[in-house]
């Protein structure tokens, strides 16, 4: 079945395949490098770099599906998509915590420690799941 992002009139020429190989290799190598950095420094910035690299791999893949065996390609694409979703979940909690901290500081209000504690617990669990999937990927 054709995916919504497949471009119907693209042709699988030798030059196009060669370009696809070069671009995807570059994008995947870059992603692996950012994943390695993420494991050394579990910061918001390194998570952001991994998220950008995942996006670049995924969107490049969408252009080049016609160049590869569709079954294998989609399996790899789905792994990249899962990692992108998981990294987004971690980022969502980071943003929530930033917003809570901003509201507290800016409005001089107090909130229950339980809220921050629960958000941090959720972040920890999501990060662990994300790291596990990254390890499987690499």
Enumerate the language-model features and the residues they cover:
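Cationic, histidine-enriched alpha-helical/coil surfaces that engage anionic ligands
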Residues: 1-138
């Amino acid at each position: 079945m054709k995916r919504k992002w497949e471009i119907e009139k693209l042709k699988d020429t030798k030059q196009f395949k060669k370009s696809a190989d070069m671009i995807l290799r570059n994008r995947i190598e870059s992603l692996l490098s950012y994943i390695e950095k993420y494991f050394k420094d579990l910061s918001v910035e390194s998570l952001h770099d991994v998220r950008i690299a995942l996006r670049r791999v995924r969107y490049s893949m969408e252009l080049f599906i016609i160049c590869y065996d569709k079954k294998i390609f989609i399996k790899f694409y789905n792994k990249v998509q899962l990692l992108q979703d998981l990294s987004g979940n971690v980022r969502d909690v980071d943003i929530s915590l930033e917003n809570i901290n901003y509201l507290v500081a800016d409005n001089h209000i107090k909130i229950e420690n339980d809220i921050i504690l629960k958000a941090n617990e959720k972040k920890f669990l999501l990060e662990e799941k994300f790291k596990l999937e990254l390890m499987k990927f690499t």
